[in-house]
Amino acid sequence: MGEEFQVGATAVGIRAKDGVVLAAEKRVSYGFYTLSTAGKKVFIVNDKLAIASAGIIADMQALAKILKLNARSYELEVKKKPTVKAMAKLLSVVMFSRRFMPFYAEVLVGGVDEEGPHLIVMDPLGSLIEDNYAALGTGAKLAVSLLDASYRPDMTVEEAKKLAVQAVKAAIERDPVSGGGIDLVVVDGGGAREEEVKVQVVI
């Protein structure tokens, strides 16, 4: 994706040995103008699945709603929760179907199923890549350098939470369109839960 189409904000995902952590900062910007410092960019789909996104807020919300509705519909019909890969594939089809007028959002799909924890990275056209960690948005280069240096496959969820916060905070400190605190979602054997981390950046 060219720099002129680079989606704003910063989102990070980490696959731990016992779950997945997704985190995103809360600033909503229009160019270099801050519209809000309370934008929600992480969404719980069900107690086994969540997404984080970087891009246009309206498109993030639309994709989250599509995923929630389809996950619930599948669960009611089949009497079990869909797998993480199945929901990522569904989202991929939705995004690719709009390739001529795409959603301006990159997405991290994270969750836990019978196969264990999964983290799947998606671009605005729906390409799928499963990975151990990823960073999206304008602060991605800043965040991923810290992830590269500190990630371990045997990390616990608690360790992954700390690393995710550090990575997003690193982006907030240097990226002018990232900021406003951090929303964080953990998905593990105990379900999906959301936390808010307040960040004070001293410049």
From Swiss-Prot:
Pfam families: Proteasome (PF00227). GO terms for molecular function: threonine-type endopeptidase activity. One of its GO terms (cellular component) is proteasome core complex, beta-subunit complex. The formation of the proteasomal ATPase PAN-20S proteasome complex, via the docking of the C-termini of PAN into the intersubunit pockets in the alpha-rings, triggers opening of the gate for substrate entry. Interconversion between the open-gate and close-gate conformations leads to a dynamic regulation of the 20S proteasome proteolysis activity. Disulfide bonds: none annotated. Its EC number is 3.4.25.1. SUPFAM superfamilies: N-terminal nucleophile aminohydrolases (Ntn hydrolases) (SSF56235). It catalyses: Cleavage of peptide bonds with very broad specificity. Keywords: Autocatalytic cleavage, Cytoplasm, Hydrolase, Protease, Proteasome, Threonine protease, Zymogen. The keyword Phosphoprotein does not apply. It is found in: Cytoplasm. Gene3D superfamilies: Glutamine Phosphoribosylpyrophosphate, subunit 1, domain 1. One of its GO terms (biological process) is proteasomal protein catabolic process. The active site is at T10 (nucleophile). Residues 1-9 form a propeptide. It comes from the Archaea. Component of the proteasome core, a large protease complex with broad specificity involved in protein degradation. HAMAP family: Proteasome_B_A. Belongs to the peptidase T1B family. The 20S proteasome core is composed of 14 alpha and 14 beta subunits that assemble into four stacked heptameric rings, resulting in a barrel-shaped structure. The two inner rings, each composed of seven catalytic beta subunits, are sandwiched by two outer rings, each composed of seven alpha subunits. The catalytic chamber with the active sites is on the inside of the barrel. Has a gated structure, the ends of the cylinder being occluded by the N-termini of the alpha-subunits. Is capped at one or both ends by the proteasome regulatory ATPase, PAN. This is Proteasome subunit beta 2. It comes from Pyrobaculum neutrophilum (strain DSM 2338 / JCM 9278 / NBRC 100436 / V24Sta). The gene is psmB2.
